[in-house]
């Protein structure tokens, strides 16, 4: 039963704490960040791994091209500890496409005070397969930091390892899948116990010919934030939460 508590605890957290943005603005929205468009819309020529979002995207064609480059001065240098293995890099590119292009992250957007963005996402429930496969693909590649959000040497215009940060394998810095997915970007993601196709977790990878599965996921979580309630069925799954949930549920 413990695995079933994760989405419910997340829902309770979201209902009680709210979000960093207006509760009426949770669906089909873009973050206020460096490369994001102000509103999502079609981008027919999105590059390669970002193409699944072409029907409705928060990223531009140029951003989608730049984030695929190893030496982009617009984006991030993946090869800061030697050349990253292609299988590993593909997961980082997919992560970047989700971050830049997805209009389905509204419930997890938080306000921040940073020079390059005013908003970020926090604790997005990432499908467990996406996290595990990311870690498996990268465990033998090299990096020098556990938190990639801060602490880089940007003096050359691209991110380089500081002198105090030696290069080791990903598995050295991230011994478990969760330590990678949750720690890498300062808890942007929270590894879900749910699988792809469940409608309860965000997918990095999906077949766009079958539609975007994250649209249903964001609607599910947004519905609780806008209504401020949790269904009676949830109480049956987690009896220990009943005293708390009963405060919100109608009689």
Swiss-Prot record:
Pfam family, one: Folate_rec
Mutant phenotype after disruption: No visible phenotype.
Record's keyword annotation contains Acyltransferase: no
Biological process according to GO: folic acid transport; positive regulation of cell population proliferation; post-translational protein targeting to endoplasmic reticulum membrane
Lipidation (GPI-anchor amidated serine): 227
Residues annotated as glycosylated: 62, 193
Domain of life, per lineage: Eukaryota
UniProt KW Transmembrane keyword: no
Locations listed in the record: Cell membrane
Binding-site residues, folate: 95, 99, 116-120, 149-154, 188
GO molecular function terms noted in the UniProt entry: folic acid binding; folic acid receptor activity
Disulfide bonds: 30-58, 50-97, 59-101, 81-167, 88-138, 127-201, 131-181, 144-161
This protein's GO CC annotations: external side of plasma membrane
Record keywords, A-Z: Cell membrane, Disulfide bond, Folate-binding, Glycoprotein, GPI-anchor, Lipoprotein, Membrane, Receptor, Signal, Transport
UniProt xrefs under InterPro entries: Folate_rcpt, Folate_rcpt-like
Topological relation to the membrane, as annotated: Lipid-anchor; GPI-anchor
Signal peptide: 1-20
Propeptide residues according to the Swiss-Prot or TrEMBL record: 228-251
UniProt similarity note: Belongs to the folate receptor family.
Protein role: Binds to folate and reduced folic acid derivatives and mediates delivery of 5-methyltetrahydrofolate and folate analogs into the interior of cells. Has high affinity for folate and folic acid analogs at neutral pH. Exposure to slightly acidic pH after receptor endocytosis triggers a conformation change that strongly reduces its affinity for folates and mediates their release.
Protein name per its UniProtKB record: Folate receptor beta
Species in which this protein is naturally found: Mus musculus
Biological classification of the source: Eukaryota, Metazoa, Chordata, Craniata, Vertebrata
